[in-house]
Structure formats: C-alpha cells, structure tokens
Amino acid sequence: MAQAVWSRLGRILWLACLLPWAPAGVAAGLYELNLTTDSPATTGAVVTISASLVAKDNGSLALPADAHLYRFHWIHTPLVLTGKMEKGLSSTIRVVGHVPGEFPVSVWVTAADCWMCQPVARGFVVLPITEFLVGDLVVTQNTSLPWPSSYLTKTVLKVSFLLHDPSNFLKTALFLYSWDFGDGTQMVTEDSVVYYNYSIIGTFTVKLKVVAEWEEVEPDATRAVKQKTGDFSASLKLQETLRGIQVLGPTLIQTFQKMTVTLNFLGSPPLTVCWRLKPECLPLEEGECHPVSVASTAYNLTHTFRDPGDYCFSIRAENIISKTHQYHKIQVWPSRIQPAVFAFPCATLITVMLAFIMYMTLRNATQQKDMVEVADFDFSPMSDKNPEPPSGVRCCCQMCCGPFLLETPSEYLEIVRENHGLLPPLYKSVKTYTV
C-alpha cells in the first residue's frame, strides 16, 4: 500500500517538473527563423546577421505577445563578435572575420527560463569571407532589351563598379580602376563609372581590376598603408538591330519555272526566318509558317509555281534584339508549252526526223551516180563476118560471166555501161554496107 502511494507521488512530482517546459514543447514545430545577412565581406569588415521568429503558416498563427518568454542563442566561432541586439522576437549580431573562408553561424530559440529545453525554432547560415574586394560590375544601356547580356552596337554603354561595403570599412580608401573592354581598348580611371561605345558586333568580355589603398593605425600607434585588390568581369553580346530585308529575285515568271529569291538581312545573326506565299502582302501571324534558323546574313528561297496568278512572298526575320517584315510581289504567267504534257512527244518527233534525214542522206550518197555511155563503132570489113551473138545471149553472158572472163575490172565496167544503152532514138536507123 505504501509503495503504491509513493509511486503516485513520484509521478505527480515528475509532472510538476515538466510544467515549465510545457510552453516550449507545445510551440516546437510551429515557428521558424528567418535569417538575413549582408555577406559576403572582405577580411576586417563587419558582417551583420539578423534572425526573426515567425510562424510557419505565413502569419495565421498568432505569435507570443510577450517577447520575453523566448531567448536567442548564437554560435559564431571563430568569427569575433562585435555587437548584439535583441528587439521583440528578433535578434541581431555583428561579427568580424580576420581570415578568409566560409564560416557557419547557427542560432536557435528556447524558452527564456530554460535554455536547455527543446528549441522552438532553429536557423543556420554560412558567411563567405574573402581577402579581396567585394563588388559587382554592372553594364547598362539606354534600351529596354528583354534579353540578358545583350546590347546594341553604336549605342553608348554605361559600365559601373558597385563596391559592396555595408559596414563602410573602406570609406577612407582611395580607388584606382583599370579597364579592359575586350576589343583592344584599355584605360585607367579614378572613377568607378565609364561610358563606352562598341562599333562592331560580337561577344566581348569587360575586365576590371580595382585597387584600394588606405592608412590604418597599428597597435603601436604607427600608421601603415593597407591595400586590397579585386578582379571583376562581365560578358557582353553586341548585336545589330534588323534594319530591313533586301530581296533579290524576279518579279515576273512563268509556270513550271524554278525561281530563286535571295534574302539579304541588314542585321546580325543568328536569325530566325519565316516565309509564306500569299495572294496579298500581309504580315505573318504567329504559327502561320515554319521558322528556319539562319546563321548568316543571306538566305536563298526556291520555289516552282504551277498555277498562274499574282503572289506575294511574306517574309519575317528576327534576332534576339528585334524583328522585321518584308514583302516581294511575283506575277506568274502561264507557260506556252507545258513541259509535263509535251516533253515526251516533242522528243520522239525530233528523234524520228533526225533518223529520216540521215537515212535519205545515206541513200542519195550510194545510189545517185552520173552514168556515161560509150559507143564503140567498128566500120572495118571484118565486123560483118563475125556477127555478135544475140543481144539476149550477150547480155546474159556479160552480166553473169563478165567478171570472170574479162581480164581487168575496167572492161567489166564498160560492159555494164553498154547494157544500159543511150536514150532511144526518134527513128530507127538503117545500116548501109558498101562492098
């Protein structure tokens, strides 16, 4: 019985010890810390870090009315703490780094009367500390281009160096700026702002070297000159606006005739070109044609018209800076001979005519010869004593056996000529013999 009483009493005492932890335990997981810092910083400069307790559900959960119920705890080693301030549900510390590196800083919030209790919220941040100057190189131009790092040629550029020194660590320093614009131009100024005008297109890198010098009092009361440097750069892409499109091509053409149109772009590539044939010269709408990427300032279009009529080439070109439109009217006339219909018949007719001419030429060359008949009259008395055989027998013998009986080919040719005879006489001649 006594043991049961002591057991119950121990439980009551345990719960009593846990009562101070109840608010923090209930609040755990409901809040979070928002951390802000003005880093990065150079060695020796003061860095400010702030932490604010906020609700996780974007403000619908009410924050504690009494800010003294909670306490902020910081860990910032090896950074040196130079100041701390708490106001309401926020806390701010200032630290200095004397060596370069990346240093973690953590913070958490607990109940004010129990720093060993479970944290209500935690936060963590890394501070980059460098031995060089910290800043940004900013390039601006009096144009509203939507593309980053793209600028116009022959238009003034403003190049500025913005030093990042929120703690005014370098407020007494003297600065010297060495500029290199990437096109062979260099200059040295004491001003952090310069103006420059690029005359050619291309990609350039602006380089800047900054030197800061100041005097600092040493622990032994002597003055020493301190120096810090920094190197910065920015990449620039200089473009030319599309001032227009020059179209070179015919304005009158026949159907079934291939046409080539050359487009000369007055601007800097790369370009996106889109074109379409329309009955009228109207601008192209978005999605009305298929865009083509062009890496040069010239482009050739080829097209073959099949139907006569009036047409218009609607052309649109754009680069990363601007866009332009151009139009080119074409009048298409019907062709006199449709090649698709008459090409084969014409070729066949020409071939037949050539073959016929060649045949007639060869035939005339082999058959047209001049015939000369030779008459040999023998008036000697012996001519009647040896009468010739009948003409039929003679012709047959000469025609069939002449080549074999005669001694020379010339005799054979004379026989052939005699067989043809002269023109028939108008009257029949009568032989008269004298004895």
Swiss-Prot record:
InterPro entries in alphabetical order: Ig-like_fold (IPR013783), PKAT (IPR045219), PKAT_KLD (IPR046846), PKD_dom (IPR000601), PKD_dom_sf (IPR035986)
Record domain PKD: where: 147-233
Compartments, as annotated in UniProt: Golgi apparatus membrane
Glycosylated position list: N34, N197, N300
Membrane topology: Single-pass type I membrane protein
Protein's UniProt name: Transmembrane protein 130
Taxonomy of the source species: Eukaryota, Metazoa, Chordata, Craniata, Vertebrata
Gene name of the record: TMEM130
Coiled coil: none
Species for this entry: Homo sapiens (Human)
